[in-house]
A protein has these predicted regions:
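Catalytic loop of the DD-peptidase/beta-lactamase superfamily, centered on the K-T-G motif
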Residues: 18-78, 203-208, 212-216, 220, ...
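Pan-zinc metallopeptidase signature
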Residues: 414-532
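N-terminal signal peptide c-region/cleavage motif recognized by signal peptidases
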Residues: 12-17
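Surface-exposed patches in mature extracellular/periplasmic domains of secreted proteins
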Residues: 59-67, 157, 228-230, 290, ...
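Sec-dependent signal peptide recognition
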Residues: 2-8
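Active-site-proximal loop and beta-strand segments within enzyme catalytic domains
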Residues: 30, 45, 56-58, 70, ...
Length: 532
């Protein structure tokens, strides 16, 4: 079937939402009412064309589902076949293995219990799960949520244990005998088995099985009608058959049982369900705004280096957008849930072919560009040599981290990090971008720039860039910020410096004349030198 795409189904559906701005403690966990509307027809056509273009580029998908939620607008598309041998089409009702997106469900469940005072984030996990044997170091709930607990993962030192069903006690026993790979807090070690420990904590505290707890407190309130633990014995005719690629051809996936990964990778859901989960997080219907912010804040190792992972979600800046996401990869499936909390967007994707992470990410990034990035001329840097390249990379990182964190903190649940004074931060960033210093040791200068967003550097690039974004939004309005992902970092800096001139910003918020001269040379634009 390579090169030939199968029949598709495109559906515009209503969405679920809850009254904005109401904290969790002021309302019960209930399913959101049906409201909202489809995207305008021209946007639906554009979304469909974008997905089709990726399918033409990557014809290995058998079935694919894509869902998009932006504020009060919703779109779901389903393409290809959920079961090639039987000729069954993929639909919005099709259920897919969620794989590691299950970790996001588990993190929500844990934080619900934290909000109720039934679990403490910084408690030793053994206070909740005494069946976990004592190790060389204690491991906290917080560290497990952020993959900082040093717990090994299946497959690293032993088999995956996926040949037959096990209960939660059996799943916990799979990892109990292994020593920690690292002292907790010192090293990021992605671990499905760490999330099994959290699943055991949910069961111990709630008195319910993990699956029962999710149904009552996560799936139900989010309107996830078809979500469940992925027990092969309870699958219905709507579940997608899985495939893998062998010598460029699709063949059926290896049959595995995922009960041994229950809280780290053992669920299934439809694309509507996954999109509903994303919407419930954006609306703070599952956990409070504060807890949502914790989930979306990247943790750091003890020496102050970011892991780019919060509690149940990875985070990163993308062209000035603050991305919160989790992917899933298992036999039978490739999945991705991507949230932009500062812009009220959720994107959900699922394929029943393994190894499609890059394809799903291309679709998601294309949707972001389509929906959120105003088209405009991009200011390209006219640069020469290594020093110019390092300066330009620094400008891009100030812009990317700063705009992303500003959007997340100003329009989402985030809190800007860092404790130092802003004038000092601007002075330090100016020194990092100093041509003379870069020319003396370009490799060392670039290395310092690449670390300057980290906690051990007091989040310098984040704090300076976020202040610039806030200044621009106050002076030019929020719509102006939407232009920068397309127009680029030079436009961001040029506009900021122009605003600073008009407002007579005090030094050192103007950077210095050397950097301003670089910007003039990079863009050819006439930026007036500082009057100070």
């Amino acid at each position: 079937m390579k090169g030939l795409w199968l029949p598709f189904l495109l559906v515009g559906l209503t969405t679920w939402a809850a009254p904005p701005g109401v904290p969790l403690c002021e309302r019960p966990h209930v399913a959101a009412p049906a409201v909202e509307r489809p995207f305008p027809e021209e946007v639906q056509r554009a979304l469909d064309a974008l997905v089709r273009a990726e399918l033409a580029r990557e014809p290995n998908h058998a079935g694919l589902a894509v869902g998009v939620l932006r504020g009060g607008e919703r779109w779901v598309g389903a393409y290809g076949q959920r079961d090639v041998a039987r000729g069954l089409p993929a639909t919005p009702r099709t259920t897919w293995r969620m794989a590691s997106i299950t970790k996001s469900f588990t993190a929500v469940a844990v934080l619900q219990l934290v909000e109720q005072g039934r679990i403490e984030l910084d408690a030793d996990i053994r206070t909740v799960v005494p069946a976990w044997p004592e190790k060389r170091w204690p491991v906290t709930v917080r560290q497990l949520l952020g993959h900082l607990g040093g717990v090994t993962n299946y497959g690293r030192f032993g088999p995956s244990h996926d040949s037959g069903p096990v209960d939660s006690a059996g799943a916990l026993a799979l990892v109990a005998g292994y020593e920690l790979e690292a002292e907790p807090g010192t090293r990021f070690l992605y671990s499905t088995w760490a999330y099994n420990l959290l699943g055991a904590a949910i069961e111990a505290v709630s008195g319910q099985s993990y699956g029962e707890y999710l149904q009552e407190h996560v799936f139900g309130p989010a309107g996830m009608e078809h979500a469940a633990l992925d027990d092969r014995r309870t699958r219905d005719e709507h579940h997608a058959a899985g495939y893998r690629l062998r010598d460029g051809q699709r063949v059926p996936s290896k049959v595995i049982d995922v009960s041994g990964r229950f809280a780290g990778g053992g669920t299934r859901a439809s694309i509507e369900d996954l999109l509903g989960f994303g919407g419930a997080l954006l609306d703070y219907r599952l956990v409070s705004r504060t807890s949502t912010g914790w989930m979306q804040t990247p943790m750091s190792t003890r020496d102050g280096r970011l892991t780019d992972y919060g509690m149940g979600f990875a985070t990163w800046p993308l062209r000035g957008h603050y991305v919160v996401a989790h992917s899933g990869a298992q036999p039978e499936t490739s999945t991705l849930l991507l949230l932009l909390p500062g812009e009220d967007v959720a994107i959900a994707l699922a394929s029943n072919v393994e190894g499609q992470a890059a394809s799903l990410k291309r679709i998601a990034y294309g949707i972001i560009e389509l929906l959120l990035e105003d088209k405009g001329p991009r200011l390209s840097a006219h640069r020469q040599g290594t020093v110019d390249a390092v300066v330009n990379e620094g400008l891009n990182r100030v812009f990317g981290y700063g705009l992303a964190y500003h959007q997340w903190a100003a329009h989402g649940p985030g809190t800007l990090p860092g404790t130092g004074g802003l004038p000092e931060a601007f002075e330090q960033v100016t020194r990092l971008l100093d041509r003379a210093a870069i020319e003396r040791a370009p490799d060392a200068a670039r290395e310092r720039l690449l670390a300057a967003h980290e906690p051990h550097e007091d989040w310098l690039l984040v704090r300076v860039g976020a202040h610039m974004a806030r200044t621009l939004e106050e002076a030019m309005g929020p719509e102006r910020l939407r232009s920068y992902p397309a127009r680029g970092p030079l436009a961001f800096f040029n506009d900021y410096l122009a605003v600073c001139e008009s407002k007579s910003c005090p030094d050192p918020f103007r950077f210095n004349e050397t950097l301003r001269a670089d910007l003039r040379r990079f863009t050819g634009e006439n930026i007036e030198p500082s009057r100070h």
